[in-house]
Amino acid sequence: KITARQIRHAVEEHRANASHEHEVQPGMVYISNPTEVGTLYTKAELTDISAACYELGLYLFVDGARMAYGLMSEANDMTLQDYAALCDVFYLGGTKCGALFGEAVVITNDTLKEDFRYAIKQHGGMLAKGRLLGEQFLALLDGEDGTGNSLYFTLAAEADRQAMAIRKAFEEKGVKLLHDSYTNQQFFVLPDEWHEVLSKNFAMTHMGKPDKTHTAVRICTSWATKAENVETLIEAVKKL
């Protein structure tokens, strides 16, 4: 994660440089929530970042590819309304949350709304059968009343629950976490022999080797994860 203090420092350092025209001019802060390692920005942190952006004349963009999983996490204190109040632009992820394709962009800054549709004239942005993108989100968000009762959020909530069950199984075996994630992405530091055993039957993303005898991995659940597959993994972990 980044902080409001880091943003201020970076921009102020740029503006204090007498040759700043040779650098890219800061114009926007881009963050992901959840982050790529499953951590979450709190409402207080995002409020501070938003204030720093406003003070410095920057736009704030939030990558929401995994936003549903973040919103349904037990550690989350953000709402969609908070995102709308604090960000200039954010988007609801589709492909990671059950949609066949596409994302739903939400623009809250009125200045950025003007002429946005001209984006279809850039880089092949005109999507044939584009209505099908919207139809997916109509189905995923049907009946949503702010309580997370739509398909979009119930799928994410179940994936988070499954991920935390997997995390519990690994922690009970004394496995250390690479990152403290409370979302559908979990990161573990496994003894190499355990990694070799589990890799034969389960898909894990290799995240590097923190030392000569351990391997860091990422295990993800999603809208498509079956309960029986989670139970099979948990039973395999117990037998290590």
What residue ranges belong to the model's regions?
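A general structural motif
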Residues: V24-P26, G57, H214
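Active-site C-terminal subdomain of aminotransferase-like
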Residues: Q25-T35, L40, M78-T183
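Conserved C-terminal alpha-helix-loop-beta "cap" of PLP-dependent enzymes
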Residues: M164-A165, A169-K238
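PLP-dependent aminotransferase-class I/II
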Residues: K1-G27, I31-P34, Y41-D48
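Active-site-proximal loop/turn and secondary-structure-junction residues that shape catalytic pockets
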Residues: T35, R66-A68, K96, W223-T225
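Alpha-helical scaffolding segments of alpha/beta enzyme cores, especially the outer helices
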Residues: H9, A44-E55, M78, D82-A85, ...
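Catalytic PLP-binding core of fold-type I/II PLP enzymes
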Residues: Y41-S73
